[in-house]
């Protein structure tokens, strides 16, 4: 719990290209949900 609520070291803008990082990025999660 809280995995999607906490942002990692991902830099803003990077998550747009990397879905995996997006999965752990709060700001990105709003755009792309975390998929297995």
Swiss-Prot record:
Location(s) in or outside the cell: Secreted
Disulfide bonds: 22-28, 23-34
Keyword Flavoprotein attributed: no
Keywords: Cleavage on pair of basic residues, Disulfide bond, Ion channel impairing toxin, Neurotoxin, Secreted, Toxin
Annotated propeptide span(s): 1-21
Molecular function as annotated in GO: ion channel regulator activity; toxin activity
Transmembrane feature ranges: none
Annotated Gene Ontology cellular component terms: extracellular region
Expression tissues: Expressed by the venom duct.
Presence of keyword Transmembrane: no
Domain of life: Eukaryota
Family: Belongs to the conotoxin A superfamily.
Comment on protein domains: The cysteine framework is I (CC-C-C). Alpha4/5 pattern.
This protein's name: Conotoxin Bu21
Originating organism: Conus bullatus (Bubble cone)
Taxonomic classification: Eukaryota, Metazoa, Spiralia, Lophotrochozoa, Mollusca
């Amino acid at each position: 719990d809280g995995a999607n609520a906490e942002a990692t070291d991902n830099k803003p803008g990077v998550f747009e290209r990397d879905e995996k990082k997006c999965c752990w990025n709060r700001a990105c999660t709003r755009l792309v949900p975390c998929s297995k």
